[in-house]
């Protein structure tokens, strides 16, 4: 059976836990300290969705400001974009708008308002009893303003919603890939139909 490859990109500020989320999902492991992603890192994972084998190609990106201008080719052919912030750090949430707009600019999807994004508010376990900085309602409002983006609150350390989030990400990526395939097939068929349809002639 042919396996479908799906490209997924994780974007967000440095330190929000993108690498930890990916390690928890792929390796079922968590490390308190690990080396920061220098540029980009690729993880592949094979799963089954609706009796279809898919290979997730998940790109983990560095979050430093100097890496925000990744080349356009890096964004091309992405099937789902995951935006990650730290629920305890306001700046990382405020940066989500920039990451969202940068992706739209670089990837240039055919229908930007319908492209599948998923927002992840990470580190829900580390507020140490203090009130969290970014309330869930604020994140929900942001998602609504962008066309009802799906939102998950996660913790890589406590294993909260990580599997559920990546399953939804994979489903959205697969749906997007199918829609692109359908559009490409339609475009290849329409010119053929137009070419083969004889023009009507009026008899005088």
Swiss-Prot record:
PROSITE patterns: RAB
Gene3D superfamilies named in the record: P-loop containing nucleotide triphosphate hydrolases
GO molecular function, one term: GTPase activity
A Pfam family recorded for this sequence: Ras
Protein name: Ras-related protein RABG1
Species name: Arabidopsis thaliana (Mouse-ear cress)
GO BP: protein transport
Keywords tagged on the record: Cell membrane, GTP-binding, Lipoprotein, Membrane, Methylation, Nucleotide-binding, Prenylation, Protein transport, Transport
Keyword Transport in annotation: yes
Residues anchoring lipid (S-geranylgeranyl cysteine): 202, 204
Family annotation (InterPro entries): P-loop_NTPase, Small_GTP-bd, Small_GTPase
Family, as annotated: Belongs to the small GTPase superfamily. Rab family.
Presence of keyword GTP-binding: yes
Protein role: Intracellular vesicle trafficking and protein transport.
UniProt motif Effector region: location: 34-42
Record's subcellular location: Cell membrane
Membrane topology listed for this record: Lipid-anchor
Tree of life domain: Eukaryota
Chief site of localization: membrane
Modified residues (Cysteine methyl ester): 204
One GO CC annotation: plasma membrane
UniProt: GTP binding residues: 12-19, 60-64, 122-125, 155-156
Lineage: Eukaryota, Viridiplantae, Streptophyta, Embryophyta, Tracheophyta
């Amino acid at each position: 059976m042919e396996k479908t490859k799906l490209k997924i990109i994780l974007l967000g500020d440095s330190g929000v836990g993108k690498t930890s989320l990916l390690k928890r999902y792929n390796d079922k492991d968590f490390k308190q300290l690990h080396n920061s992603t220098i540029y980009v890192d690729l993880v592949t994972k094979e799963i089954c969705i609706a009796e279809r084998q898919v290979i997730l190609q998940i790109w983990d990106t560095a979050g430093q400001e100097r890496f925000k201008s990744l080349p356009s080719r890096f964004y091309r052919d992405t099937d789902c974009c995951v935006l990650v912030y730290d629920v305890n750090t306001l700046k990382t949430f405020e940066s989500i708008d920039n990451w969202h707009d940068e992706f739209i600019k670089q990837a240039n999807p055919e229908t930007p308002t319908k492209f599948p994004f998923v927002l992840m508010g990470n580190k829900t376990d580390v507020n140490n009893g203090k009130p969290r900085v970014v309330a869930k309602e604020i994140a929900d409002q942001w998602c609504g303003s962008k066309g009802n983006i799906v939102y998950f609150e996660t913790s890589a350390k406590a294993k909260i919603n990580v599997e559920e989030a990546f399953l939804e990400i994979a489903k959205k990526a697969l749906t997007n890939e199918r829609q692109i395939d359908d559009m490409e097939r339609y475009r290849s068929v329409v010119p053929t139909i137009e070419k083969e349809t004889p023009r009507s002639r009026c008899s005088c």
